[in-house]
Amino acid sequence: MHFVYIVRCSDGTLYTGYARDPKARVKVHNAGRGARYTSGRRPVRLVYTETFQSVGDALRREMALKRRSRAEKETLIGRRRRRPS
């Protein structure tokens, strides 16, 4: 499985990325070994994930999300929270 994830940084900003294991990737971010963007904004908290079968689909979605505005990402995060389990 391949995942696109969004984390909320300690300063309230959002970071979007790709990972095979998003929970493990968040641990890497929080250890200061993740993306440069998140290293100075720790701790980060996982707030959104999407699952994909192919790496290509996941990377295309990651790029699409990175082009979205913060407001659009917040709406997406809010929708995911309201979905029934």
Task: State the predicted function of each range.
Residues 1-85:
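GIY-YIG nuclease catalytic motif and its immediate N-terminal context
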